[in-house]
């Protein structure tokens, strides 16, 4: 059975959870008997994938048009495969077009939904209408849709009522607990000048990740606690400036706020996570949140917003704490987040207990081999 995975992100250009998912899923699928996987990605040639550059004439076009043009180039090369599996709206249209051209079954993995991310218009401009159209077209025509959480499955059916519920299945993301494991390399902390007790945020600078909410919440957190921000790649200048201004405001009065703008190498990332007593995930939209699983793999307690699929990962009171989010009352969310940080950081013994329980939960319930096996079952089903 030949499977073609289509993705925008592929090493070395992996910047989000969807990219991590594709890399780990590909590795695990290749360990499944009888499965042959190739990868078609954006960003130019790769040694281990078919990489596509933006077609000539579209180099200066809106990002959404660039994606559609690249998708058509990819679709042209998907004639000789058994199943096409696309990830994110950037790649969905390639699978949609190839399905029309060749009749090849197309499966979509729902990592996020354009109708639930209106702030993407800040990044794409009018291209947001194109991305929304491309996603809608692909979802409604897909042979199957993989939702990365039950929450995401409900969102798919709500956003796209024309989709047959029988086509939408939940297969949650996984985490490699061998790669994300406790790493007590203090030299990494020394490199960044980090000392003392601290909490950590890891993620892109986008409205979705709620970093601005966290920074406003941190203003009222005791200065005894440090904050590490592994945060870069702003979606657009507006959110980039807002976050930078908030960070500089904190750093003006505190010496224990560290901003790591570049993507840290894996070894450094696990050391930064392990050194933290609390992982912070203030997302306002999160279909599952692989980053929480990565923190749990490193035995770090998680404080997260109770949105999307996060409650399916973070067991409230067992591996961390959840804070309700209401888009109409951001001040309450920030205040509640402040209080939760203060409460948890004042209980180091509890944090250690939550962290150890988190690794156990990640290991027992979120292994990639199980994800791959379930995915292969779906491939087989759409081929019948």
Ranges and model annotations:
Residues 4, 193-220, 228-230:
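Conserved donor-binding/catalytic core segment of Leloir-type glycosyltransferases
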Residues 86-91, 110:
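Short His-centered aromatic/hydrophobic patch
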Residues 151, 174:
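Carbohydrate-associated surface elements
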Residues 196, 240-263, 267:
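Nucleotide-activated donor-binding/catalytic signature segment of Leloir-type glycosyltransferases, i.e.
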Residues 271-276:
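Short alpha-helical donor nucleotide-sugar binding micro-motif in glycosyltransferases
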Residues 278, 301-304, 314:
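Short hydrophobic beta-strand element within catalytic cores of glycosyltransferases
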Residues 284:
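Aromatic "clamp/platform" in nucleotide-sugar-dependent glycosyltransferases that forms part
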């Amino acid at each position: 059975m030949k499977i073609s995975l289509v993705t925008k992100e592929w090493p070395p250009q992996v910047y989000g959870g969807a990219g991590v998912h594709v890399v780990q899923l590909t590795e695990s699928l290749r360990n499944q008997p009888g499965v042959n996987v190739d990868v078609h990605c954006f960003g130019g040639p790769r040694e281990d994938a078919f990489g596509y550059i933006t077609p000539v004439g579209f180099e200066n076009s809106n990002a959404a048009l660039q994606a559609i043009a690249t998708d058509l180039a990819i679709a042209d090369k998907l004639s000789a495969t058994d199943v096409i599996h696309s990830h994110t709206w950037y790649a969905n249209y390639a699978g949609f077009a190839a399905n029309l051209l060749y009749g090849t079954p197309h499966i979509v993995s729902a990592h996020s939904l354009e109708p639930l991310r209106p702030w993407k218009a800040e990044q794409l401009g009018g291209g947001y209408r194109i991305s929304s159209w491309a996603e809608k077209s692909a979802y409604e025509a897909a042979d199957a849709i993989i939702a990365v959480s039950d929450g995401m499955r409900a969102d798919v059916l709500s956003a796209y009522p024309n989709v047959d519920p029988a086509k939408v299945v939940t297969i949650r993301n996984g985490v490699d607990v061998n790669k994300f494991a406790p790493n007590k390399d203090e030299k990494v902390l020394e490199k960044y000048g980090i000392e003392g007790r601290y909490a950590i945020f890891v993620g892109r600078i986008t409205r979705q990740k709620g970093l601005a909410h966290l920074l406003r919440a941190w203003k009222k957190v005791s200065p005894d606690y440090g904050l590490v921000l592994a945060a870069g790649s702003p979606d657009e200048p507006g959110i980039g400036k807002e976050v930078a201004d908030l960070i500089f405001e904190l750093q003006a009065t505190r010496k224990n706020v560290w901003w790591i703008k570049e993507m840290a190498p894996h070894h450094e990332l696990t050391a930064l996570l392990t050194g933290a007593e609390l992982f912070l995930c203030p997302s306002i939209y999160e279909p599952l949140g692989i980053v929480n699983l990565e923190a749990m793999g490193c035995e770090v307690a998680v404080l997260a917003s109770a949105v999307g699929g996060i409650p399916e990962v973070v067991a409230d009171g067992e591996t961390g704490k959840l804070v309700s989010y209401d888009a109409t009352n951001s001040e309450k969310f920030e205040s509640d987040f402040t209080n939760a940080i203060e409460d948890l950081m004042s209980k180091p013994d509890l944090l250690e207990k939550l962290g150890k329980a988190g690794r156990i939960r990640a290991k027992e319930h979120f292994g990639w081999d199980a994800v791959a096996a379930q995915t292969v079952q779906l491939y087989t089903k759409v081929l019948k």
